[in-house]
Amino acid sequence: DRNGNLYKVVSERQSEAAKRALNRKKDRRHFSFANMRNIREVIAKLSTTDCGRLLVLIGHIDFKSGILVNERGNAMTKKQIQKTVGLSERAFRDFFRKMTEMDVIQETADGKYRINPDYHFVGSTDSVEVVKAFSSAVRKLSGRLRPAELGFVYKLLPHVHYDTTMICADPFETDPCKIRFYNVKGIAELVGMDEDAARRVLNKLRKAGVLAETR
C-alpha cells in the first residue's frame, strides 16, 4: 500500500484451517495446476474480465479427467458453460469463439470440453513452475467477486513465489535476498490498473481471504 506493504497469497493450509469448521463434508483437496509460464500467453491476449471468466471455469475442472464438469460431476454442455460464466447468448458466442480460437478451451474427440492442459492441467508434476487452483476455493470466490476482480486474481498467478507465496517479479528465485516483491503500485502496473483502483480490489481480496498483507 502507500506504506510499501507487500501482498502474499494465503496458503491452502491457512485457508483450509479457517474453512474446515464451515463444511467438513466437501473434499477441498481437488485441484488443478496452472502452468505459470504458459498462462502469461493467455493473460497477454485476454481482457481482465475474460481472465476472470476463465478462472471461473478452472473451478470446474474435474480433478481426474481434466474435463469441465457441472456440480453433479457430469461433463458440461456448451449451454452450461454459458450459464457458469454468466453471459448472454450473444456475448457468450463471442467469448467462446475467442477461447477456442486461442486454443484455451478445447473440444475432445467425444464432444466434451476442457481447458488446454498446456495452461491448466490435472495429475501430478515435479515442476515448481506451477500454482495450484483448488476447485472449492475458486468456486467460492466466483460467488463473491465480479469477473473483473477474478481476472485480477488470475493475472497474479504467474507472479506467486513458489516458496513464500508472495507476489513478486521473480517467482522462481531461490535466493530470498534477490526476490523483488511487488507493493500495491507494482501490482497495479502488473494488472494494468491505476493505483487507487488496485488498492480497492486488493482490500476486497484481503477481506475475502485470498491475499494477506505483510509488512
Region spans (language model):
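Short recognition helix of helix-turn-helix/winged-helix DNA-binding domains
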Residues: 1-71, 117-178
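Winged helix-turn-helix DNA-binding recognition segment
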Residues: 63-113, 166-215
